[in-house]
Amino acid sequence: MVREGGSLPVRGGLLLTGLPFFFLGGPGYQSGRSFQGAWDLGHILFFALLGALLLGLINRRPAPPAYGRTFAFVFTAVFAAGLAVELLQMQSGGRTPDVTDLVRNQLGCLLAFAIFAPRDWRWTRLFRAGVAGLLVLALWPLSRSLIDETLAVRQFPVLADFETPFETRRWVHPSQLRTQTDIVRHGDRAARVQLTTARFSGVSLFHFPGDWRGYRSLRFSVYNPREEPMELNCRIHDVHHRDHGNAFQDRYNQQFQLQQGWNDLTVSLDRVRDAPRGRTMD
């Protein structure tokens, strides 16, 4: 029912090679968005191989089952294997199971069926077109990250001015950011920060070129719409700070009093470098 392609031992060998990567390596705290996006696509590749292996094994039977039964069996088996991986990751590394990973796993299974679907099945073309569309959607986060990372390098030393489409994704808690054109300091756009009632409400620039050698200051502008002053806490830290306890004395901290209207603020990078107690910031 399903035509077999490739070598089953090769598929099995590739699966055994890829299996350890679910538990070793992978993106870390400071990993770039494109690396994270590319790593996530590994779920699709791995489970496409698993689906192809199962299809090949079923096809070797003298009387393979009907195509619908084959689809149901392989789709369910891939889901069970993916769920087992998520649970093992939770047990071995403390990871929280990720529903989007399970979705990628099933997309990999669908990809295997799209590749090895029988030519005489009347829905083959439509099925392949649908899977291709889903793959485009799955590739979009990686594509978007690559585009913005390229723009960030070209824009440097400007870290963010919100003139390009994906800059809000350089920030932590991007849902609290909304680009707008009503109140801007320069150019056509600025970002509006929606504060919450949380004790530490705000946003953090997280993805940006990290080599600031040769520059003396960090400058940014903040608009305060209120008549009364507003206190802004600015903090800058490096990977060492994150990996060694997040101590207050191990990062740069400064408070600014924002007056009504635009406030143009400057941070000395020499002070940032020397801020951690007993070391210099990377």
What are these regions, as identified by a protein language model?
Residues 221-227, 237-239, 270-272:
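Solvent-exposed strand-to-loop "edge" motifs in beta-rich extracellular domains
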Residues 220, 264-282:
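Extracellular beta-strand ligand-recognition surfaces/modules
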